[in-house]
Amino acid sequence: RVLPEKTNHFVIEQISSEHGKDVFEIAISENGKIVLRGNNELSVAMAFNRYLRDVAHVSYDWFSVSPLQIKGELPLPISTIRMACSAQERFFNNTCTFGYTFPFWNWERWEKFIDWLAMNGVNRPLMLAGQEKVWLNVWQSFGLKKEDIQAYFSGPAHLPWHRMANLDKWGGPLPVSYIEGQYRLQKKILARCRELSMKPVLPAFAGHVPEQLKQVY
């Protein structure tokens, strides 16, 4: 997805982890191709990113024009490059980031972002989208009305603070179309993360319940 026109310049090989930690190598094959080695998909993505940065001198971020455009032959590494991760768990994101632009991203934006996460070695991304679908189902199973639950939720840009039990209803009610759309999007996000050997961090119950629950219990 990042450099599709140059895929025939690369060879992917699997190697063992180093003392239980992710490791990658960049080398040259006998027929002059660029070899990216890693102990899993994430490590290969890291090798690819390091090749782009240190050998091809090209940077990629989630705002980059994708795919990248590199004219001519790709440069070869002078010697084998090997790197091992110093930490087993590499976490990224925080609760509040899901109230900035994340609530309004489509799949195309998320796909680029997830590629960037993998290329930079993140294996424990916090992924909080779509959880309102779960809570909607839970509160309905307790006998609450859908309209009351929608009014309890905050609007998209304020959901992080609602999820932390700081506020209710602000900027709401939350449309069912948004709840369903974020749920579908989250399933695609999680599937892609797992394809790239990530283990996404998901939310648990924070103890925050709708006021209307008092009318039922």
Task: Enumerate the language-model features and the residues they cover.
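N-terminal helix-rich structural modules
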Residues: 20-23, 35-36, 45
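Residue-level recognition of short, structured coil/turn motifs
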Residues: 3-4, 57
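Short active-site loop/helix that positions an aromatic residue
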Residues: 42-55
